[in-house]
Amino acid sequence: MNRIKEFYRISRPAPKRELDDTACDRYYRRLRLQAFTAATLGYSLYYVCRTSLNVMKKPILDSGSLDASQLGVIGSALLFAYAVGKFVNGFIADYCNIKRFMATGLVVSASANALMGVLGLAQSVIPTAVVFVAFAVMWGLNGWAQSMGAPPAIISLSRWYPLKERGTYYGFFSASHNLGEFFSFLFVGSIVTFAGWQAGFFGSAAAGAIGGNVILCWLHP
């Protein structure tokens, strides 16, 4: 438990660098751009992991793996967990390392997608009821992990951009929802078309893994 607390502890201030005014300004602008890029691209890839099931619903129904009622329950599990998680994780994000917190959420979300793909591949030897329950649990876990995305991203933007610029950059950040849906339907949809819905979950998991690395490298607390 202590190791977990230490891992998510708020970072100590970085060592002071001896730079002239021009170099300092250039360095500051680079860090700001990296933080904005990580928040926006990272949250876009959060959306890929969140909306992947929407891309897979029709192929899953066509394959007879699950019916519409079961898919409705699975989707509701994500929404319920996401709603509760937004309330809880918004508070937690204020007291922890936002870079690691946001990256953890995306890695967990990607893992949930990957496990959905594994379950899909193994469905022929697993009872349908077990597949349904496992999907609901995994998608609920995904919903909770998804709630770990927005709070750290918004905190980062508020730290790096003053009030006179914050609205502009937050407006660009808000487009990450649409960007993520575009990535999901284009990238994941293409994978589903050529390799099946199970592979689609692996594709969204790969996108989440990429996003987690971007956040760890560029989202400066």
Q: Can you say where each PLM-predicted feature lies in the sequence?
A:
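Cytoplasmic helix-loop-helix junction between adjacent transmembrane helices
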Residues: 138-178
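Residue-level signature of mid-helix packing/kink "hotspots" within the transmembrane helices
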Residues: 51, 79-87, 181-182
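C-terminal ends and interior cores of transmembrane alpha-helices
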Residues: 107-128
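Helix-loop-helix hairpin linking two adjacent transmembrane segments in secondary transporters
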Residues: 173, 177-220
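Hydrophobic core of transmembrane alpha-helices in multi-pass small-molecule transporters
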Residues: 112, 127-148
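Extracytoplasmic
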Residues: 34-66
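Helix-to-loop junctions at the C-terminal end of transmembrane segments
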Residues: 85-97
